[in-house]
Structures are given as C-alpha cells and as structure tokens.
C-alpha cells in the first residue's frame, strides 16, 4: 500500500463514493494520480446486507477502480460521532496520506451522517495543517477540500468529464450486489432484504440521468459535479471551454 496519495476521498458509507464520484476516481487513476478511499463507518445500520458483506463488496469495487487503498474507520453508523477523538483520528489520516486534494460530501446533505462527514473532514483537513497541533506525524494541509453531490443538486464549481470512465464507474457500483438492482442477474429468487430507494431498478437510471445532466453542462456525455468554497485557477481559458458553445 502506498500511503501517500494525490487525492483522498472520504465518505460516510461504502458505495457513497462510487455513486457520486466513481468516474472521477477511475479517470484520475488512469491519468496516473494516486487515489485513496476512506469510509468513516462500517455501515452497520444499513437496511440491506451486513457490515462484513459490504466491506467485501467495497474491496472488490476498490480493485475495479484501481485505487491505492480503501479502509474503514468506526465512527458509528446512524449517528456518526464527530467529537475531538474522531477529529484527531481524521487529522492523523490526512497527515499520514498527505493528499493534495480531499473530497468529502457537501456538508448540508439529506442524510445526517453525510452532513457530519462533510463537516468533520473539512475541519480535520484544516487542523491537519497546524504545526502547533502535534501528533505522531508532521503537519500537512491539502490544497483544497472539494465536495461531491449526493441527494441535492447545486450549481457546480467544476465538472469532471467522466465519459471514458463511465463503464468502470458502473462496474464498481455493480460490485455492491447487496445494495443495488442487478439487471443482468439471472437469479429467479428474490432477495430477502427489503426493497429500498437505492435497490429500486429506477435508481441507477437516476444516477445516469444526473451524470448526463452535468455532462451536458460541459458538452460531454457524462459528468460528475463538485463544489469548492473558492474558485479554481485556470491556466488555459480556451482549453477549459473547448468543444462548448455559448
């Protein structure tokens, strides 16, 4: 495992990352960037599957995406803890992996665990840069915290073209067989798990529709949207809008 990464993605639960930014991860890996994934909970409050099943599925998805590592913390699902102990643990994670960019959920999402994840990851990324805050590793502050979108649609700060990585993203999502509808399944037996919003056959169609919407904003087939609290720097204005019409 390579501890140092360029991009570090945080999520509350396994599969949050694939749904929101799996294409960006796959594209970044193809572009030669080192990527790591960290979930803050084991998903023990999930309606479908078990923590053990979801962990195995997450590791299969990680191999499909080609990331350097993926592991879980244990901040408590369905009431994610955000005290000082958890904050210090995340500070240590950021200092250990020295990412240039941290990704986290937008901190005003529908699910309370997503809200708390976005907020504590934002705070920890900042505090990780304080030299006076001593831990077992030296201070490190990422260049920016970028927020991915889940339930709510916001005006994006930037959109990543994930058209070439779309099939990889969907393969990674399909690794979570306990969570989502599998249109290719030939099994006639019905799952004993309850049907929920994300296991409905229409759900993955919604994910694709959203990606097509964000892709249309930048003139491509599929896009994934992100929000930052400060605008990015552009070195080439023409290239940034290539293939677009006013």
Q: Which stretches of residues belong to each language-model region?
A:
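Metal-dependent de-N-acetylase/amidase catalytic core
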Residues: 1-8, 84-246
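Active-site rim/loop-helix segments in enzyme catalytic domains that contact anionic ligands
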Residues: 1-97, 227, 239-245
């Amino acid at each position: 495992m390579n501890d140092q990464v360029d991009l570090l993605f945080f999520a509350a639960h396994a599969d949050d990352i694939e749904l929101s930014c799996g294409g960006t991860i796959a594209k970044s890996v193809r572009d030669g960037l080192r990527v790591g994934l960290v979930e803050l909970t084991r998903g023990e409050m999930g309606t479908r599957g078990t923590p053990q099943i979801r962990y195995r599925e997450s590791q299969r998805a990680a191999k499909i995406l080609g990331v350097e590592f993926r592991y879980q913390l244990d901040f408590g699902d369905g009431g994610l803890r955000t005290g000082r102990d958890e904050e210090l643990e995340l500070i240590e994670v950021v200092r250990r992996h020295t990412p240039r960019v941290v990704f986290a959920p937008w901190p005003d999402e529908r699910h309370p665990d997503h809200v708390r994840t976005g907020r504590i990851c934002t705070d920890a990324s900042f505090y990780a840069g304080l030299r006076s805050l001593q831990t077992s590793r030296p201070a490190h502050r990422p260049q920016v915290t970028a927020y991915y979108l889940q339930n709510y649609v916001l005006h994006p700060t930037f959109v990543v073209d994930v058209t070439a990585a779309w099939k990889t993203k969907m393969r990674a999502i399909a690794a979570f067989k306990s969570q989502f509808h599998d249109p290719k399944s030939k099994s006639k037996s019905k799952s004993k798990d309850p049907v929920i919003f994300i296991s409905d056959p229409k759900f993955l169609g919604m994910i694709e529709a959203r990606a097509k919407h964000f892709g249309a904003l930048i003139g491509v087939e599929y896009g994934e949207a992100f929000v930052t609290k400060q605008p990015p720097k552009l070195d080439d204005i023409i290239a940034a809008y290539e293939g677009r019409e006013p």
